[in-house]
UniProtKB/Swiss-Prot annotation:
Belongs to the bacterial ribosomal protein bL34 family. It comes from Lactococcus lactis subsp. cremoris (strain MG1363). The keyword Ribonucleoprotein applies. The keyword Membrane does not apply. This is Large ribosomal subunit protein bL34. The gene is rpmH. GO terms for biological process: translation. GO terms for cellular component: ribonucleoprotein complex; ribosome. It comes from the Bacteria.
Amino acid sequence: MKRTYQPHKKSRKTTHGFRSRMATKNGRRVLAARRRKGRASLTV
């Protein structure tokens, strides 16, 4: 059986990247929350 996680750089960036987060209101909420928490890495 094939495993669920089949990594690809492009799909990773397009779904979880900074630009895609900034594109939506909720994505910006995610970034704001991560900034508030003091995360070293905001996105991928």
